[in-house]
Amino acid sequence: MEVIAENRKARFEYFILEEFEAGMVLLSSEVKSLRERKVNISDAYVVEKNSEVWLHNMHIAEYKAANRKNHKPKRERKLLLHKKEINKLIGQIKTAGITVVPLSVYFNDKGFAKTKIAIVKGKKLYDKRATIKQREWDREKSRLSKNNL
């Protein structure tokens, strides 16, 4: 599994409730840009439309060599999931305070572009502070243990 892009902001901003692996409907120029790692998913989110799930606001840069057949960088991309997973996501999207965001984009072992999406709930400011405090304490513990050896 070759990770192309990771949404580190999502892991800090949200509590992750459940994760799914989804395929994406992409154009050939988009796949070539993904192979060059020219993608940004930090502002992306998932929306339900006509009983399908769509990925919005994911930026895949235009591929230089594809002149006329190029794609729009921020176009909507359809996500490929099983029907049960789609129904579960749609139910969660309609719940207040819950959203679905991509966590990472990668190529699987067969060479297909996949995205890991998650059902998330927003953190409050004090939750973010607690996360920072815990991270700093873990770093301090590792420093102390290295110095004692």
From Swiss-Prot:
Domain of life: Bacteria
InterPro entries in alphabetical order: SmpB (IPR023620), SsrA-bd_prot (IPR000037)
Subcellular location: Cytoplasm
Keyword Cell membrane: no
Keyword presence, RNA-binding: yes
Function as written in the Swiss-Prot or TrEMBL entry: Required for rescue of stalled ribosomes mediated by trans-translation. Binds to transfer-messenger RNA (tmRNA), required for stable association of tmRNA with ribosomes. tmRNA and SmpB together mimic tRNA shape, replacing the anticodon stem-loop with SmpB. tmRNA is encoded by the ssrA gene; the 2 termini fold to resemble tRNA(Ala) and it encodes a 'tag peptide', a short internal open reading frame. During trans-translation Ala-aminoacylated tmRNA acts like a tRNA, entering the A-site of stalled ribosomes, displacing the stalled mRNA.
HAMAP family on file: SmpB (MF_00023)
Protein name listed in UniProt: SsrA-binding protein
Gene behind the chain: smpB
